[in-house]
A protein has these predicted regions:
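Alpha-amylase-like alpha-glycosidases and glucanotransferases acting on alpha-linked glucans and related
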Residues: 1-133, 158-214
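Conserved, well-ordered alpha-helix/loop/beta-strand core segments that scaffold catalytic motifs
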Residues: 125-158
């Protein structure tokens, strides 16, 4: 469900007064004239935007806060996603199966006080995803207006190191410690004489069926 924070439209955030910047250089230097994408630049910029969104959030009009809260209530996935991103950042982006045990198994009792302690960071991730969703919907509306069709691509399986797998282990062929029971791939074919091993957990369809594929 989540979108990549690198797609945030900074101009839109400024125009709509979600962030206040008197000088674009406040966001820091970015490397120009490069023939490749600079991931470090993108990460640093996203972090700065997140902090700006948080700083300006308390001064936003009540209507916007209500819209945000309504979006949160309709997108339950955001709770686990935001928590996952913040925990991952705390442990130097290690995969979740290398986190300390209580984080790895998602011990709710243990995490309760930790979530309160990191509430600002968690709010930042929620705000980023809310803005991304709003901006995406605006693009989709614009495309519809001019009869432009958008095509998306979905993977067969879910990444092992993802919020979805970490928070819903029982739905995948994976143990609580992160070890794979079964993993996806394809046998040898025209494209690969040795076949392919993708490293993503397969689905426990019986578990999905019991939840009505919710």
């Amino acid at each position: 469900f989540a979108l990549n924070p690198w797609f945030l439209d900074i101009d839109n955030l400024i125009e709509e007064n979600f962030i206040f910047i008197s000088n674009p250089e406040e966001l820091g230097p970015t490397k120009q004239n490069k023939s490749h994408f600079d991931f470090d630049d993108a990460d640093n910029l996203t972090k700065k935007l997140g902090h700006l969104l948080l700083q300006c959030w308390s001064s936003q009009v009540e209507e916007r806060k209500l819209a945000f809260n309504e979006w949160i209530s309709k997108n339950s996935w955001i709770e686990d996603y935001a928590l996952f991103v913040v925990i991952k950042g705390e442990f130097n982006m290690l995969p979740w199966w290398e986190w300390p045990r209580e984080f790895k198994i998602k011990n709710k009792k243990f995490l309760k006080s930790w979530i309160k302690e990191k509430s600002d960071k968690i709010l930042i991730e929620k705000l980023i995803q809310w803005h991304l969703d709003e901006q995406w919907r605006a693009i989709k509306k614009f495309a519809n207006k001019y009869n432009v069709k958008l095509i998306g691509d979905l993977p067969f399986y879910v990444s092992r190191d993802s919020a979805d797998v970490w928070s819903n282990k029982s739905l995948f062929s994976i143990l609580k410690n992160g070890d794979l029971i079964f993993q996806s791939g394809v046998p040898p074919d025209y494209f690969s004489s040795k076949g392919q091993l993708w490293g993503t957990p397969t689905y426990f369809w019986s578990k999905h069926k019991s939840t009505n594929f919710d």
